[in-house]
């Protein structure tokens, strides 16, 4: 089991299919992960994902859902 403290700034975030969806900007209260707005997938906006989507953390943050589903469900922050 990972801890939210295992998630570090600038880590790559990938879906369960191994495809890149973003880069960690920071975590919020141990409940959400903010992705950077400068990433190629971000379209110039920050995005929030639930910490519950995280399956495990090594050098990357691996989600428990495919990249397309995660990008459809993430919260865009203006």
Where are these regions (language model features)?
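Peripheral interaction segments used for macromolecular assembly
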Residues: 1-78
């Amino acid at each position: 089991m990972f801890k939210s403290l295992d998630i570090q700034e600038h880590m790559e975030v990938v879906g369960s299919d191994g495809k890149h969806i973003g880069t960690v900007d920071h975590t919020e209260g141990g409940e959400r992960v903010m992705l950077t707005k400068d990433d190629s997938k971000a379209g110039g906006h920050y995005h929030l994902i639930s910490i519950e989507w995280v399956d495990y953390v090594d050098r990357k943050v691996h989600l428990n859902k495919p990249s397309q589903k995660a990008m459809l469900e993430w919260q865009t922050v203006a």
